[in-house]
Every structure is written in C-alpha cells, then in structure tokens.
Swiss-Prot record:
<dbReference type="InterPro" id="IPR029048">
    <property type="entry name" value="HSP70_C_sf"/>
</dbReference>
<keyword id="KW-0597">Phosphoprotein</keyword>
<keyword id="KW-0547">Nucleotide-binding</keyword>
<keyword id="KW-0346">Stress response</keyword>
<dbReference type="GO" id="GO:0098630">
    <property type="term" value="P:aggregation of unicellular organisms"/>
</dbReference>
<dbReference type="InterPro" id="IPR043129">
    <property type="entry name" value="ATPase_NBD"/>
</dbReference>
<feature type="modified residue" description="Phosphothreonine; by autocatalysis">
    <location>
        <position position="173"/>
    </location>
</feature>
<comment type="similarity">
    <text>Belongs to the heat shock protein 70 family.</text>
</comment>
<dbReference type="InterPro" id="IPR029047">
    <property type="entry name" value="HSP70_peptide-bd_sf"/>
</dbReference>
<dbReference type="GO" id="GO:0009986">
    <property type="term" value="C:cell surface"/>
</dbReference>
<dbReference type="Pfam" id="PF00012">
    <property type="entry name" value="HSP70"/>
</dbReference>
<feature type="compositionally biased region" description="Acidic residues">
    <location>
        <begin position="598"/>
        <end position="607"/>
    </location>
</feature>
<keyword id="KW-0143">Chaperone</keyword>
<comment type="function">
    <text>Acts as a chaperone.</text>
</comment>
<dbReference type="InterPro" id="IPR013126">
    <property type="entry name" value="Hsp_70_fam"/>
</dbReference>
<dbReference type="GO" id="GO:2001065">
    <property type="term" value="F:mannan binding"/>
</dbReference>
<feature type="region of interest" description="Disordered">
    <location>
        <begin position="578"/>
        <end position="607"/>
    </location>
</feature>
Length: 607
C-alpha cells in the first residue's frame, strides 16, 4: 500500500510528515525548513506558495494569508483577476506540501490524513476534505489536532495508562482536549475551544498598539497604508516571538511612511510586561475552555498526568503560566509544538495502512447536533463529546393537522434556541399522508462518520418514504465544482512544472555561456582560430536564443554549444598536462649530484 502522508494544515504555518518504519518524520521543504508558511501569492499569473510568498508579501498586495480562518464560510478572496474559495487557496498549500513529500519519497503521493482544530464544525471539516480533493489527495481521515498531538506523544507509551490534557493554541484557533491513553487506545474524553482565537490575534494587539503610538507621535494613521500594514504585521510577529525569550525587544521600521518634512521611521521598544498587558484578555479567553473540558470529562486537575502544549503560540510566557496555574502541572516539553500535529497525522496514516499495530483512535464530536422543533427550540440528538463514528435516531411528529411535508432544519451548537446555533443545512420530507397533528411518525437519524462529517436521514415510518442528505453548508461545493477545481489545480501544477523547467533551462544556458567565455579566455592563442570562431558563433547563437521565448531553441543551442565547449575543455586539459610534463622534465634535467665522493657500503658501529 502506498504511503499516506500526514498534513497539519495550519493558519500561519503548515507541516507534512511521513511514517518511516515505526518513526514519524517531518519532511523539510525545498528551502530546508520543517514548517511552511500557509501563504499564497499571485505574481504575473504565477502561483507562489510558502516561504517565497511570505517574503514578498510586503510589496505584493495579491498575497493571501490565514485562509484557514475562512474555511467553512461562503467568503471568497479576489486575486489574479478572479475569485477563489478558501478551499481552492488551501488546496494550493496542500499541493505544495504534496510536492514536497513526493520529492522526498521519490514516488507519487495520493493519500493523506489532514488535521483540523478539534472545535471545527461540520462545514469547516467538509471544506478541508474538499481542499484535499482539489489538491489531488484522497483524504483518508480528518483528525483533530490535539488528538494527533497525543498520538505522536503517546505512541511509544501504549503500555501506560495516562490522562493527558492537550492545550493547542495555533495561529488562528484554540482547542483543549482531554484524552485517556491505555493499551494502545487513545480515547478522547472531552474537547472545548474557540475557532476565533490564535496567534494572529496576539499579533493584531501589537499592530494596534504600534499604529496608535505612531499616530500619537506623528499624526499619521498607518492602518490606512497597506504596505506599511504588512510591514507592521511582520514586525509584530517577530516582536511576539522575541518576547518569548527576552523581556524587551526593539521594533525598527525605517522609512515606514512620509510626512510633510520627509520620510518617517518607526522606532519603538516593546517590553514583555506591556505585551502581557495588551494581550491579557486573549490569554484569559483560554481559561474557560480548560475548565469546560475538565468538567465535561468529569475530571479534576489532580487526575491529569501530563499536559502537552501544541501550536507556536504556546511559547508565549503568559500562556504557559496560565496553563501551569489552571492544571497545577508543569507542561511537558518533550514534543515540538510546531511539528507534533503533522507527526501524529502521519502515525494515523500508518494505522490505516497497517504499519502501526494495536493503536485505536476514539475521537469525539466537539458540538451537539440536533434539529429545530416547534417554537424555534433546538432539540439535541447527539450531545457534544460523543465518541465518533456514531448514529442516533429520534421520532418526531407534525405540528399541524394534515401537514403534507416537514422541514428538517439541522443545527450544531450548545444554545437552547435554534436561532442561536450554527445552521448546517435544511431539507424537506414530502408526501406525508393527511392526518391529525401528532399522528405521523417521522424518524430523524443523525450519522457522524470518523471524520466528524454529518449526514441526516428523515423517514416517514407510515409510508417508509425517506430523504437523506450529507450536510453541505452555504460554503459546500458540489461534486462538479470540485472536479473543475481539481482540473484547474492540475493545470496549475503542470504550468508550474513547465515554468520551473523553463527557468532551469535558462539558468543552465546562462551558466554555459559564462563557462564558455571563461574557457575561451584561458585558451587564447593556444588553439586554432577556427575552433575559437566556431565556439564564439555557437555562444552568440545561444545568447540570442536566450533573448527569445522559444525554450526548445534554447535547449538545442545549449546542446550544440555544450558539445563544442566540452571539446575545448578537453584541449585545455591536455595542454595543461603537456605543460606539466614539460615542466617536470626541465626540473629533472636541472637536478645534479650534490657530492661525487659519496659511495655505497656497509658499516659497523664500533663500541
């Protein structure tokens, strides 16, 4: 069975891992980095992903960041003269990670396990699965990020019984999960979180502070300047990271803007104390989900054996201190918070292929599921933290006499009234025979698969007529839309490969021209004029081809010059050897006996 890669598709950074033997290994990207920025940019029709996209973000307005925060919504982003869904942009990141894995493994990769925040709802999970499909990946499993982290941590500890609290604060989402490990079973007891809280929010607090301070000093609002704002974002992210290791950091942005008197520079010192003050409400927002998860699991802090920190934002000292205070435990530092999720996803891939034995993953649904009933009430069929996959049925009836149809309004959330919860979808069961209210028996069944994706069935028990839907939110893509996006993505991949080949061909041709010029200089006056002229002509033809767009012509001219250059190089080598030989003979001729009175003989030491 082919390899199943593990992908952590993050808000700010993503990572890809693969199982090698029994060990999960992070695959570095072509730049040698173990994580790849979740950044996509468009420039001159070209799609740029990762480190290269992040580097040019300041000067390129067509740069898209933190697309994960839009997954599961109908919001689109405009770039490159068209509109893209969050799934399409995410697919570009996934394609990049897929290519990284293929280059490392030396084989085609078609299957993946992709992680999502534990608190992702059905629409967000479906969008993630669609993104994988667009990228040319069969998504074997969607795994919750904290669960994947626990899997990576506990794989070599399957003989121990432990209860683990995973505190996962990433770039854009926050989750807390509590798991029980024992005999190879990873059982999620409870999960809680906030899909709108992460490292980006901490960055924004610093940006807002810098903008306010600069406006106070100079009367200019940097928030209105897109290029300045991108520089502020980069500086804020760096300052946040710096303050995890030092108590003061200097923010220096020369020529940030211009005033009436000329260019203006931004110079500010940010202390950790000030940073803690600015972000106090964000840190506090993580406290309640920790308590909620413990309460839902029916545990106290004394029952927790280990606390794992996941996500780059857990390096913030105030966050670590809050975790310490809430759990009465020193967080476990044995896992890399940026890499552990992808590693866990790769392990789950190994479980699916059978390479990892005796490991069972029991995940849960993060939010309650149900339908709207009379009076706008939310009636739950499946409670939050129910182990998945699962199925639950309940019988309802009509609310009016001779009602011919029922509308099924499917919801996800915890609030008592339907209007306050997340709508997953609506469908209708029709042709109900005329009868007084309360007589027809309508059975509603919820199914949640191992990926946390919901399907709902309504059945008239009297007529046995039924209607089933796999939930698609407003952002859900049809199979036709996904197929079209897949074709577009494949075309982009082919175009990218062609573009890379063109660049490589041009670079090799440039290098050949340079090397030929150097060789001709070294051979000046040492070879026949006809050979030099032949090389010069071939070199000029290649230079002329490089000015055009015909790649096949560049290849042909390169091959012609390469052959001539090789012959010249052989001549240069032969001449160098001949010169060395002559020099050696001259040295031998110059050497003479130093003492004609020397003689051979035996001697005996006298004692």
């Amino acid at each position: 069975m082919s390899k199943i890669i593990g992908i952590d598709l993050g808000t700010t950074n993503s990572a890809v891992a693969v199982l090698e033997g029994t060990e999960s290994k992070i695959i570095p990207n072509p730049e040698g980095n173990r994580t790849t920025p979740s950044v996509v940019a468009f420039k001159n029709g070209e799609i740029i992903v990762g480190d290269a996209a992040k580097r040019q973000a300041v000067t390129n307005p067509e740069t898209i960041i933190s697309i994960k925060s839009k997954m599961g919504t109908s919001e689109k982003v405009s770039a490159n003269g068209k509109e893209y869904t969050p799934q399409e942009i995410s697919a570009m990141i996934l394609q990049n990670l897929k290519a990284t894995a293929e280059a490392y493994l030396g084989e085609k990769v078609e299957k993946a396990v992709i992680t999502v925040p534990a608190y992702f709802n059905d629409a967000q999970r479906q969008a993630t699965k669609d993104a994988g499909k667009i990228a040319g990946l069969e998504v074997e499993r969607i795994v919750n990020e904290p669960t994947a982290a626990a899997l990576a941590y506990g794989l070599d500890k399957t003989d121990k019984d432990e209860k683990i609290l995973v505190f996962d604060l990433g770039g854009g989402t926050f989750d807390v999960s509590i798991l029980e490990l024992g005999d190879g079973v990873f059982d999620v007891l409870a999960t809680a979180g906030n899909n709108k809280l992460g490292g980006d929010d901490f960055d924004q607090k610093i940006i807002d502070w810098m903008v306010a301070e600069f406006k106070k000093e100079n009367g200019i609002d940097l928030a209105q300047d897109k290029m300045a704002l991108q520089r502020l974002k980069d500086a804020a992210e760096k300052a946040k990271k710096d303050l995890s290791g030092v108590t003061t950091t200097q923010i220096s942005l020369p020529f940030i803007t211009a005033g009436a008197a000329g260019p203006l520079h931004l110079e500010m010192a940010l202390t950790r104390a000030k940073f803690d003050e600015l972000t106090h409400d964000l840190v506090e927002a993580t406290r309640q989900p920790v308590r909620q998860a413990l309460s839902d699991a029916g545990l106290s802090t004394s029952d927790i054996d280990e606390v794992l920190l996941v996500g780059g934002s857990t390096r913030i000292p105030a966050v670590v201190e809050l975790v310490r205070h809430e759990t009465n435990k020193e967080p476990n530092k044995s896992v890399n918070p940026d890499e552990v999720v992808a590693m866990g996803a790769a392990i789950q891939g190994g479980v699916i292929t059978g390479d990892v034995k005796d490991v069972v993953l029991l995940d849960v649904t993060p939010l309650s599921l149900g339908i709207e009933t009379m009076g706008g009430v939310f009636t739950k069929l499946i409670d939050r933290n129910t182990t998945i996959p699962t199925s639950k049925s309940q019988v309802f009836s009509t609310a009016a006499d001779n009602q011919p149809a029922v509308d099924i309004h499917v919801l996800q959330g915890e609030r008592p009234m339907a209007a306050d919860n997340k709508t997953l979808g609506r469908f209708q069961l029709t042709d109900i025979p005329a009868a007084p209210r309360g007589i027809p028996q309508i059975e509603v069944t919820f199914d949640i698969d191992k990926n946390g994706i919901v399907s709902v069935k309504a059945k008239d028990l009297g007529t046995q007529k039924e209607q089933t839907i796999v939930i698609k939110s407003n952002s859900g893509l049809s199979d036709e839309e996904i197929d079209k996006m897949m074709k577009d993505a494949e075309a982009n991949a082919d175009a990218d490969a062609k573009r890379k080949e063109e660049v490589d061909t041009r670079n090799e041709a440039d290098a050949l021209v340079f090397q030929t010029e150097k060789t001709l200089k070294d051979l000046e006056g040492k070879v026949e004029e006809a050979e030099v002229k032949k090389a010069e002509e071939a070199k000029e033809e290649l230079k002329k081809a490089l000015e055009g767009e015909d790649i096949d012509d560049i290849k042909a001219k390169s091959e012609a010059l390469s052959e001539i250059a090789q012959n010249l190089a052989v001549k240069l080598y032969e001449q160098a050897n001949a010169a060395q030989g002559e020099a050696g003979q001259a040295t031998d001729a110059q050497e003479a006996p130093k003492d004609d009175n020397t003689f051979d003989g035996d001697f005996e030491e006298s004692k």
